[in-house]
Amino acid sequence: MEEGKGTEKKGCIITVIIVCIVLTVGLDIVAGFVGLQAQAAQQYVKHDKLECKAPSKTAFVLGIIAVSCLATAHVSANVIGCSISNLFQALGALPKNKITTYFNMACLFLIWVVGIFGALILANGIWSNTESRIRCRFTNNHVFSIGGKVCFLHAIVSGIYYISSIVARARHFHRTKPNKTKPSELKPIPTEPNEAEPNSTPNP
């Protein structure tokens, strides 16, 4: 009964982690599409000067939504990554392969780099569409488009990080899982009969 409850509890935890992973990757995808929509909204505003567009309120709002989704997905990626490590550590499944460990660390590093880079690009696009700008400057008209593509890249890197972490630890867990034998399957060990000890007491 206790083993069944423990297995059911572990299954529920793994299911929750999988749902959170899907939501995290989904937030990255939503951020990418919103960034592309912000780029499309910015293209509709009229030119004030050459290669310089007027601020777009729609692009400004969509940019805020995109960077919010990216930030939420980034925080969730790190929290879920730590949860996966803690879960398999509790189950006694920590991979001893250094290559797998280095690969996971590289993916985590890429998640931070891509997340920060995407947030900075989207923030630049948001700033370029603020109504409080004193003058229109020469800016890149494809900022939101680049930011949206970076959000898609963040989703891909996060997915690779999750899959590599789960597969490596689950494989190690199955290899190191002890084989439990039932008491009925245990065979008695045959014992050799003890030799008769010589009688040390003299006969009367």
Swiss-Prot record:
Pfam families attached to this UniProt entry: DUF1218 (PF06749)
GO cellular component: endoplasmic reticulum membrane
Tissue: Only expressed in inflorescences.
InterPro entries reported for this sequence: DEAL/Modifying_wall_lignin1/2, DESIGUAL
Glycosylation sites: N179
The keyword Glycoprotein is annotated on this UniProt entry: yes
Protein family membership: Belongs to the DESIGUAL family.
The name this protein goes by in its record: Protein DESIGUAL 4
Organism: Arabidopsis thaliana
Gene this chain is encoded by: DEAL4
